[in-house]
Amino acid sequence: MVLRQEPTTIHELRVENIQHGVEFAKEAVSLDTTDGTSWTILGNAYLSSFFTIAQNPATLRLCMSAYAQAEKDVVAKSNPDLFFNKATALKYQEEYKSALESFERAMLLDPTWEIPRTKRDELLKYLRDVQNLINSKGRMKPKRLYQMVQALDEKHLGPYKGGSYTSGEKSVKLQLVQLKDLTPGVNVEKLVFGKVVCWIQDSDCVPFAFCIVDQEKTCMAVTVYNLAKGRGVTVGDSVAIPEPYLTHQTFAYAGNDFDFKSIRVETPVILVLNGRKLGRDQQAGVKLCSYKKTD
């Protein structure tokens, strides 16, 4: 996929190159629908498109579908690149167990390639940190935690205060609920509100992750995507999240048991921080780190 690998300094040119790359990859697949290498290239092209052009879930589904087709080919199925890049996509989808297994598959296919092992270990560390920080409520001392919870003030709901939010001609009802009341998936017309108790470091810096506690001292992780460089939250900030998307991670891997809940936020512009809705200047695209192993 030479076209996608050309260095460009202009974002528009890079987008155009990726679009052309997708079209060429689709053409290659159409010439031989059993060629796993072509399917792998198409999957990589869709992955680049998802991160660079528009983070449309449909594009990511096309990416995963292409990888699934590639795995039907014995030759492509033995390629560690396929499973490494698949793991990258799975990590972004927060399908962590599958991501870990895909990194491991890349490791098994090429034991001399260190990057999959490094990324697998980094993801494991991140997940352990998430689990530990949620369990310890950000390692916050009881007195400090009590003070922070007491400082939660509904005036910091900003435009979400009052049970509804209006943008243009559209109005959405928003009921303030506790974190424990959330259910997996999108919580339509619900609103959660809490204090930031810690950050969670990730080697890839994507997503920007932190923990919040609500009035009942329930602690939960929040993962924010598309956050501009240098932006974020500070411990003690009040954060309101409308219609939160909840995921519940429950799995075991390599002697680690994970059981935690987190809220996924696709764009920071929906957040209200200390009473103020974040602006477009807080948003940035995700930079994709995919790999092609050099022989």
Role assignments for model-derived ranges:
Residues 3-13, 48-57, 94, 114, ...:
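Short coil/turn linking the two alpha-helices of tandem helical-hairpin repeats
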Residues 33, 75-77, 111:
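Short coil turns that delineate tetratricopeptide repeat
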Residues 226-242:
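Short nucleic-acid-contacting surface segments enriched for D/E, G, S/T with interspersed K/R
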Residues 187, 195-226:
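OB-fold (S1/OB) nucleic-acid-binding surfaces
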Residues 242-294:
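OB-fold/S1-family single-stranded nucleic acid-binding modules
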